[in-house]
Protein backbone atom coordinates (compact mmCIF):
# COMPACT_ATOMS: atom_id res chain seq x y z
CA UNK A 1 0.00 0.00 0.00
CA UNK A 2 2.83 2.41 0.86
CA UNK A 3 4.55 1.53 -2.39
CA UNK A 4 1.40 2.30 -4.42
CA UNK A 5 1.06 5.74 -2.81
CA UNK A 6 4.79 6.45 -3.10
CA UNK A 7 4.85 5.52 -6.79
CA UNK A 8 1.79 7.67 -7.44
CA UNK A 9 3.36 10.72 -5.79
CA UNK A 10 6.63 10.19 -7.59
CA UNK A 11 5.04 9.75 -11.02
CA UNK A 12 2.61 12.62 -10.55
CA UNK A 13 -0.34 10.24 -10.80
CA UNK A 14 -3.10 10.67 -8.24
CA UNK A 15 -4.15 7.30 -6.82
CA UNK A 16 -7.86 7.73 -6.09
CA UNK A 17 -8.46 4.23 -4.76
CA UNK A 18 -7.08 0.72 -5.03
CA UNK A 19 -7.94 -2.87 -4.25
CA UNK A 20 -5.20 -5.36 -3.38
CA UNK A 21 -6.32 -8.96 -3.85
CA UNK A 22 -4.60 -12.30 -3.37
CA UNK A 23 -2.84 -12.43 -6.72
CA UNK A 24 -3.46 -9.04 -8.35
CA UNK A 25 -4.53 -5.47 -7.70
CA UNK A 26 -6.67 -2.74 -9.21
CA UNK A 27 -5.96 0.99 -9.24
CA UNK A 28 -8.17 3.94 -10.07
CA UNK A 29 -5.93 6.89 -10.91
CA UNK A 30 -6.13 10.42 -12.24
CA UNK A 31 -3.31 11.46 -14.54
CA UNK A 32 -2.75 15.22 -14.76
CA UNK A 33 -1.92 17.00 -17.98
CA UNK A 34 1.74 16.15 -18.41
CA UNK A 35 2.78 19.47 -19.97
CA UNK A 36 1.21 21.45 -17.13
CA UNK A 37 2.51 19.16 -14.36
CA UNK A 38 6.08 19.30 -15.66
CA UNK A 39 6.16 23.12 -15.61
CA UNK A 40 7.11 22.90 -11.93
CA UNK A 41 10.55 21.74 -13.07
CA UNK A 42 11.14 24.62 -15.51
CA UNK A 43 12.74 28.01 -15.08
CA UNK A 44 15.10 29.21 -12.40
CA UNK A 45 15.61 26.46 -9.84
CA UNK A 46 13.70 23.93 -11.93
CA UNK A 47 16.54 21.44 -12.06
CA UNK A 48 16.99 21.59 -8.28
CA UNK A 49 13.24 21.03 -7.83
CA UNK A 50 13.45 18.01 -10.15
CA UNK A 51 16.42 16.60 -8.25
CA UNK A 52 14.60 17.15 -4.94
CA UNK A 53 11.60 15.32 -6.41
CA UNK A 54 13.79 12.42 -7.54
CA UNK A 55 15.45 12.22 -4.13
CA UNK A 56 12.10 11.30 -2.57
CA UNK A 57 12.22 8.06 -4.52
CA UNK A 58 15.86 7.23 -5.18
CA UNK A 59 18.57 6.40 -2.66
CA UNK A 60 21.11 8.92 -1.40
CA UNK A 61 23.91 7.08 -3.22
CA UNK A 62 21.95 7.10 -6.50
CA UNK A 63 21.29 10.83 -6.19
CA UNK A 64 24.96 11.52 -5.41
CA UNK A 65 25.96 9.58 -8.52
CA UNK A 66 23.39 11.43 -10.64
CA UNK A 67 24.58 14.83 -9.39
CA UNK A 68 28.18 13.77 -10.10
CA UNK A 69 27.25 12.65 -13.64
CA UNK A 70 25.46 15.94 -14.32
CA UNK A 71 28.48 17.84 -13.00
CA UNK A 72 30.83 15.83 -15.20
CA UNK A 73 28.63 16.41 -18.27
CA UNK A 74 28.76 20.14 -17.63
CA UNK A 75 32.45 20.15 -16.70
CA UNK A 76 33.32 18.83 -20.16
CA UNK A 77 30.86 21.27 -21.75
CA UNK A 78 28.20 18.73 -22.71
CA UNK A 79 25.02 20.47 -21.58
CA UNK A 80 23.03 18.37 -24.08
CA UNK A 81 24.07 15.16 -22.29
CA UNK A 82 23.05 16.63 -18.93
CA UNK A 83 19.65 17.68 -20.28
CA UNK A 84 19.14 14.29 -21.95
CA UNK A 85 19.92 12.57 -18.65
CA UNK A 86 17.29 14.68 -16.84
CA UNK A 87 14.76 14.33 -19.67
CA UNK A 88 14.98 10.55 -19.26
CA UNK A 89 13.51 10.97 -15.79
CA UNK A 90 10.92 13.52 -16.92
CA UNK A 91 9.63 11.14 -19.61
CA UNK A 92 8.53 8.69 -16.90
CA UNK A 93 6.47 11.27 -15.02
CA UNK A 94 2.68 11.42 -15.57
CA UNK A 95 2.91 8.10 -17.42
CA UNK A 96 0.69 5.30 -16.10
CA UNK A 97 2.61 2.62 -18.03
CA UNK A 98 5.93 3.70 -16.53
CA UNK A 99 4.35 3.86 -13.08
CA UNK A 100 2.91 0.34 -13.35
CA UNK A 101 6.18 -1.08 -14.69
CA UNK A 102 8.15 0.43 -11.81
CA UNK A 103 5.52 -0.59 -9.25
CA UNK A 104 5.53 -4.22 -10.38
CA UNK A 105 9.33 -4.37 -10.51
CA UNK A 106 9.71 -2.92 -7.03
CA UNK A 107 7.01 -5.17 -5.61
CA UNK A 108 8.67 -8.24 -7.16
CA UNK A 109 12.03 -7.31 -5.65
CA UNK A 110 10.47 -6.74 -2.23
CA UNK A 111 8.48 -9.99 -2.37
CA UNK A 112 11.42 -12.07 -3.54
CA UNK A 113 13.70 -10.63 -0.88
CA UNK A 114 11.12 -11.20 1.84
CA UNK A 115 10.51 -14.82 0.78
CA UNK A 116 14.10 -15.71 -0.14
CA UNK A 117 13.32 -16.11 -3.83
CA UNK A 118 15.01 -14.97 -7.03
CA UNK A 119 13.82 -13.89 -10.46
CA UNK A 120 10.87 -11.81 -11.58
Q: Can you describe what each PLM-predicted range is?
A:
Residues 1-120:
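Short catalytic/metal-binding and nucleic-acid-binding patches
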